[in-house]
């Protein structure tokens, strides 16, 4: 898994203080991003269409994860929207792409990681395949694939970042019924991933823990 990552991204991840996974949740606001006080040692991970890409900054490391749509033979969110393309143009050495669920051989491009379906980590290999009704699940969500990979990296030498999830707390939006969300949420809450509540959900319980008394914005 680690070998799949571009060498430049591995260097930045070893230096990172935080890796923050951002869900495609419409309830995420500019205030939620401002409250994180993001800086150059933060890695921000977005998924597929990256609906909150307008809030991203070229100051951070940005990773864009795209899942493969097997029935329509394309990656969700590609080609990127103009606001994402601008980030790659402004900060090409700090923007990376992860392609998940690749089913046919592909040649890696600079700053692009390729993961085949399915990523050989126990949490993903054990992912439910069938519903009680007998209807199959589509497999792990793009965000869950990335979350498990970044959590796994924390067990490898040299990676010491804190892992956060923003917008994975179900404040708004809908969940596509093709994924085993109960399995994904149960794993997340039992893992070392720290779920950040959105401003709309009330007081941020994690704020004093992360910023050790610094005044919230």
What do the predicted segments below correspond to?
Residues 1-217:
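Metal-ion/cofactor- or nucleotide/acyl-coenzyme-handling active-site neighborhoods
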């Amino acid at each position: 898994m680690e070998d799949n990552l571009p060498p430049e991204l591995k260097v930045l991840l070893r230096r990172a203080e935080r890796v923050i996974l951002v869900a495609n949740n419409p309830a995420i606001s500019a205030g939620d991003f401002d409250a994180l006080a993001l800086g150059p040692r933060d890695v921000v991970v977005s998924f597929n269409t990256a609906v909150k890409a307008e809030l991203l900054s070229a100051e951070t490391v940005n990773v864009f994860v795209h899942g493969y749509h097997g029935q329509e033979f394309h990656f969700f969110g590609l080609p990127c929207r103009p606001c994402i393309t601008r980030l790659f143009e402004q900060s090409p050495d700090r923007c990376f792409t992860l392609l998940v669920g690749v089913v046919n051989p592909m040649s890696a491009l600079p700053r692009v990681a390729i993961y085949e379906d399915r990523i050989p980590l126990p949490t993903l290999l054990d992912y439910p395949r069938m519903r009680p009704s007998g209807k199959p699940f589509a497999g792990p969500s793009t965000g869950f694939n990335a979350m498990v990979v970044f959590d796994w990296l924390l067990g490898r030498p040299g990676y010491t970042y804190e892992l956060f999830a923003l917008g994975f707390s179900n404040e708004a939006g809908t969940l596509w019924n093709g994924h085993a969300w109960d399995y994904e949420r149960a794993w997340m809450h039992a893992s070392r991933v720290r779920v950040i509540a959105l401003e709309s959900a009330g007081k941020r319980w994690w704020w004093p823990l992360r910023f050790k008394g610094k005044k919230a914005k």
